[in-house]
Amino acid sequence: MKISLTFILSVLIIFVSSCATTTSNKKYLEDSNNKSKYFVLNQINKSSNKDLANALSKLYELKKLNESEKNLLVVSLKNGDIKRSYANEIEKFLKHSQKINSSVLKLNIGTSEKNKEMLVQSLLKENILFSISFNNDNFFEINDDVFASNLKFYCQSFIEEQNNKLENMLLRNEKILIVYSSDYEYEANALMLNNSEHEYLKINDSDYENKLQNILEINNSFNKAELISSFDKNSKIQHTPRLRQDLKKIYFLIGYNEGKSVVPFLKSFTTDLQLFSSTRIFHEADSLNDLADFENLSIPVSKNFIAKAENNNFNNLKGKFENLLLDDYINIEKAYQNNIFNSKIILNTGLTQINRGACVNRNLSFWNIDINSIVDQS
């Protein structure tokens, strides 16, 4: 059989185009996850050192600088290691830093014992003057579940922002499969009301294998392979199942008990499916190493946020994440109480800007989980 040159070129073009798209998407995700890093490095001339970048990061994180870090920033402003176009902003932040560390941060909060302990530990770690009350009237309430709290300055909770990011991306284009468990049935039913064109599948620990194989038509593919094999008992056919072609993306509304089994199960059949979830799918995991089960799952949270969780001593990842969110709340309180507005600051969730009277936007970005990159980073 002769294969035409046109056919070969067509295949090559498709292959190269696919590789280019994958590379482009990967670079976009990397750039999105390094906004804070680029924000800092863009202000420094190439001759500058790592210590300067670290000191500048701490300045924009509203963290307390030691004398050595302050002196380094002042000297770098004079000798040109910091770009002239950023000098005024950095000088302004040095004044903000001095004010933050000479004034008392005042907090009046109503919340659970768990959150009280985290807040006090975070404030002690900040090494600043503070006054915190949990009993006075007119307190600001933080839900026991920090993920479900808007934390005073946000219009939405962290989990609401994640869900909105996922739904805006996934529900408006081609048909997708939404896999949910009984814990998230209410949310799945709410999605069905306005998004009935998508496929929905309820699963549990014991039935997910059969249900997923049926809806993705994996069983049909295996049955055809067995039929072909039956014609020649002596032949051994290597078979890779062909999945439904109209479902390329799966959105999970499940917890860790289901997720740690379901995601690896699907990946064992194909790498072509794009898998999405909020961070809830691994909240109950013990450590970042457990994310190996979720390799290449796309989540609407930056790699940097996830990597920071390894440094916190809590029983599971949810506790680590909640601690990071409360740290962000404290930093925004610092900004408000010291009139730091209309300037970019670096939070655990990423680069953001505080505008007086306006909701703070976390500017979430997607990350395809890569366990090696966060273990190396942490």
Name these PLM-found stretches:
Residues 2-10, 19-378:
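Extracytosolic ligand-binding ectodomains
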